[in-house]
């Protein structure tokens, strides 16, 4: 019975992340929504690993790998956003066309 609750929560987090990513106009908010999506995927991996793969822990190891990649992605993304903010004085996605001067 706990499997259904974990999957519903993960689907809810994933849906919130997708909705926020589609409707977000701020780059920092879009990065946060992307992190929410990755956390929902990690929750699915750990849940399925717990219920269906008790001995090998492949899902747990893979989720730790995803967390490390997500941390690097967040650091690089925030560095890019801060650089864009320093140059353009805005973090709005629709105002930051980097191909124009």
UniProtKB/Swiss-Prot annotation:
Organism: Ipomoea purpurea
Enzyme class, spelled out: translocase
PANTHER family membership: NADH-UBIQUINONE OXIDOREDUCTASE CHAIN 4L, NADH-UBIQUINONE OXIDOREDUCTASE SUBUNIT ND4L
Protein name listed in UniProt: NAD(P)H-quinone oxidoreductase subunit 4L, chloroplastic
GO cellular component: chloroplast thylakoid membrane; NADH dehydrogenase complex
Catalysed reactions listed for this entry: a plastoquinone + NADH + (n+1) H(+)(in) = a plastoquinol + NAD(+) + n H(+)(out); a plastoquinone + NADPH + (n+1) H(+)(in) = a plastoquinol + NADP(+) + n H(+)(out)
Function per UniProt: NDH shuttles electrons from NAD(P)H:plastoquinone, via FMN and iron-sulfur (Fe-S) centers, to quinones in the photosynthetic chain and possibly in a chloroplast respiratory chain. The immediate electron acceptor for the enzyme in this species is believed to be plastoquinone. Couples the redox reaction to proton translocation, and thus conserves the redox energy in a proton gradient.
TM annotation in the entry: 2-22, 32-52, 61-81
Protein family according to the UniProt entry: Belongs to the complex I subunit 4L family.
Subunit structure: NDH is composed of at least 16 different subunits, 5 of which are encoded in the nucleus.
Localization annotation: Plastid, Chloroplast thylakoid membrane
Database matches in HAMAP family: NDH1_NuoK
One Gene Ontology term from the biological process aspect of the record: photosynthesis, light reaction
Claim: Ribosomal protein is one of the keywords in the record: no
Membrane topology: Multi-pass membrane protein
């Amino acid at each position: 019975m706990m499997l259904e609750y974990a999957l519903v929560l993960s689907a809810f987090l994933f849906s919130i992340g997708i909705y926020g990513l589609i409707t977000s106009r701020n780059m920092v908010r879009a990065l946060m929504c992307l992190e929410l999506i990755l956390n929902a995927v990690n929750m699915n991996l750990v849940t399925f690993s717990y219920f269906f793969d008790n001995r090998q822990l492949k899902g747990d190891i893979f989720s730790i790998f995803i967390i490390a990649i997500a941390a690097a992605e967040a650091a690089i993304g925030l560095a890019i956003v801060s650089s864009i903010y320093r140059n353009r004085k805005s973090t709005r996605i629709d105002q930051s066309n980097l191909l124009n001067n």
